[in-house]
Regions:
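Glycine-rich phosphate-binding active-site loops on the catalytic face of alpha/beta enzymes
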Residues: 4-10, 50-61, 104-124
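Catalytic cores of alpha/beta
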Residues: 34-46, 91-109
Length: 131
């Protein structure tokens, strides 16, 4: 899968087409303040949407709470349009918020700092219990 940031791509539709023509799964990442409307016409072409729940740049940032609504909104759009698009969330995912993130509609999570700071095995086991 190749993920491109919507904000960094001048010709998003063409980029997605080129990725798909290569036989690769295509995904678009959205920064926290980017509106879901930028996906209106390309969503059916996407295999996944990555919602950044922190501002990109460095690890260990806190999850931005209002983005749970954005996850929920995207899940509703995907279901309303009868699509199979995965929703990935990256940024500030912890044991304290992962259940709410999944309940809102994400089905793929990135939990970097929450897993790799401390005992990795124990952290993974704790995530699996919550999930």
């Amino acid at each position: 899968i190749i993920t491109v940031h919507a904000e960094a791509c001048t010709h998003l539709d063409r980029t997605i087409e080129k990725i798909k023509e290569s036989g690769v799964l295509a995904s678009v990442a959205l920064n926290p303040a980017t509106d879901l409307s930028c996906l209106d016409y390309i969503l059916p072409k996407l295999d996944m949407v990555l919602l950044m729940t922190v501002n990109p740049g460095y690890g260990g940032q806190k999850y931005i709470p209002y983005l749970t609504d954005k996850i929920r909104d995207l899940r509703q759009i995907v279901e309303k349009r009868n699509l199979k698009t995965d929703i990935e969330v990256d940024g500030g995912v912890t044991l304290n918020n992962v259940r709410g993130i999944l309940d809102a509609g994400a089905n793929i999570i990135v939990a970097g700092s929450a897993v790799f700071h401390g005992d990795v095995r124990s952290n993974v086991e704790e995530f699996l219990k919550v999930m």
